C-alpha cells in the first residue's frame, strides 16, 4: 500500500 511504500523509503533513508 501507500504507507508501505513510505515505510520502505524511510527504511532506505535510515530513518
UniProtKB/Swiss-Prot annotation:
GO terms for biological process: defense response. Expressed by the skin parotoid and/or rostral glands. The keyword Secreted applies. It comes from the Eukaryota. It is found in: Secreted. Keywords: Amidation, Amphibian defense peptide, Secreted. GO terms for cellular component: extracellular region. The modification Leucine amide is found at residue 15. Its main location: secreted. Caeridins show neither neuropeptide activity nor antibiotic activity. This is Caeridin-3. It comes from Ranoidea gilleni.
Amino acid at each position: 500500500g501507500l504507507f508501505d511504500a513510505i515505510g520502505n523509503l524511510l527504511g532506505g533513508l535510515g530513518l
